[in-house]
Amino acid sequence: QHAPEGQVIEGRYRVVSRIADGGMATVYQAVDERLGRTVAIKIMHTQLAQGPQRDQFVERFHREARSAAAIANPHIVQVYDTGEFDGLDFLVMEYVHGVNLRYEMNQQVTFSVRETLRIVGETLDGLASAHRAGVVHRDIKPENILLNDRGHVQITDFGLAKAVSQATLSSTGMLLGTAAYLAPEMIQHNQATPQGDLYSVGIMAWEMLAGKVPFTADNPVTLVFKHVHEDVPDITTACPGINAGVAAFLARLTARAVEDRPQDA
């Protein structure tokens, strides 16, 4: 555990408790003693960047954080500050009271069309602001969609995937969790586009309605192969009674070719 409870970081942020452990970071609840508000601190794992890659990672990490901080939208988790603690880079963000979409998926398995479209609509609204600011998320998945205590979407981790994937040579571990949502052009050409974010949203919506992702496989390589070489099955194959307009909307979001998807969120 990097930051014990009660520890004060940079003479300002007092750690209250650990919220979550992820592959690339540990997240803590903390209090910004200068402003007297609760914040979330994401401390990046040091093994992500060692030696000569370290400087590159730090520069990219701070650049991505600056980009994310420039996006103003109620559906995006605000970034307040960045810094270094014990040789580890950290991000200070708005603290969201609530759960992530993955937690909700585990609780209720499938969602109504109305609820799915509401969550998708709010996610697209947040992404539209980001894309206008020139920021692509690259890693949209249920774990990065937070639902606050009023049930509204707040997207987290903008640009972190970019900073991390370029710092780790073996990004296969990262791929595993994310492969189910990655757009074909991202897999084939490492090409991050706004339309790639839309594809990920489409897969997520498919999963919310069907209770499972459209493609499954025993390993990430096979899974990635399917995203590149197969069309996402029509949602009506999993949910026969679904509205034709909704099915057509999902088909556009999850089109294999970038140019067949909507041009913007």
Report each predicted region and the residues it spans.
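Protein kinase glycine-rich loop
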Residues: V15-G23, V27
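AlphaC helix of the eukaryotic protein kinase fold
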Residues: H45-A70
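Activation-segment/catalytic-loop signature of the eukaryotic protein kinase fold
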Residues: T82
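Conserved short submotifs of the Hanks-type protein kinase catalytic core
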Residues: D86-N100, E104
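Activation segment signature within eukaryotic-like protein kinase domains
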Residues: I119-V120
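Protein kinase catalytic-loop region centered on the HRD/HxD motif
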Residues: T123-V135
